Amino acid sequence: MILKKTSLPKVVKNILLDKKEPISLVHFVTNRCNARCSFCFIDFDDPKTFSHELTLDEIDVLTKNLGNSLLNVNLTGGEPFARKDLVDIAKKYLVNTTIQSIYVTTNASLPDRIKNFAEEVTAFDNQVELTFQISIDDMPDNHNRVRKVKNLFDKCIETYRLLKRMGDNINPVVSI
C-alpha cells in the first residue's frame, strides 16, 4: 500500500513504539438489518436494539479524534446499507482521518444502494480503495433459508458482478 495521507515512518513509529493511535477501526454503524440470520447475535426482539446509533454529528467528532495514523475503516453492522447516510459517514472518515481504504461488510441485499455508495465515495475521493465483503453461507436455497431473505443469494451474485465492473479501486470479495 502506498501511503498517500501520512508517512510510513510515522505509521511504523505509531505501531511499534507509541501505540497511541489506531491504524484500523471497525465501526459498527447500525444494528438494523433486513435479514434475520439464524446465527446472528443481534436481538431483534429487544426494543433497545435499534437505539444508540451514533449520529452524523457524533461521527464527525469521533473521526476528528482518531489521530493521524488511521489507514482503514470497516463499516459493518447489522446491514450497513440500512443507514441512508452511509455515504456521509464514509466522507467523514475521508475528510477527518488519513484512511486510504474503506471495507464494508454487507449481506449484498441492496445492490442499488451499494452501487450508489461506490460511485459517490469514489467521486468524492478517487484514491480511496473500497472493499465490499459479501458473505455466502451455502448453496442458494440454504443461503436464503438461513438468512430468511427470498432471493438473497441471487442479489449477492448481482452485487458482486455490478461491483466487479465498476473500477480498479472497487474490490468485491466473497467469503464462503
Predicted regions and their residues:
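Extended hydrophobic secondary-structure segments that form protein cores and membrane-embedded regions
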Residues: 74, 105, 131-137, 173-176
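Short flexible/disordered coil segments
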Residues: 54-57, 133-145, 167-172
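Residues within well-formed alpha-helices
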Residues: 89, 155-158, 171
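Conserved radical SAM core fold
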Residues: 80, 108-112, 133-149
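Conserved strand-turn element in the central/C-terminal portion of the radical SAM core barrel
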Residues: 104-105, 160-176
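Conserved alpha-helical substructure of the radical SAM core
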Residues: 2-129
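Glycine-rich S-adenosyl-L-methionine
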Residues: 147-165
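Noncatalytic linker/hinge segments flanking ATPase motor cores
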Residues: 68-72, 115-120, 141-151, 170-176
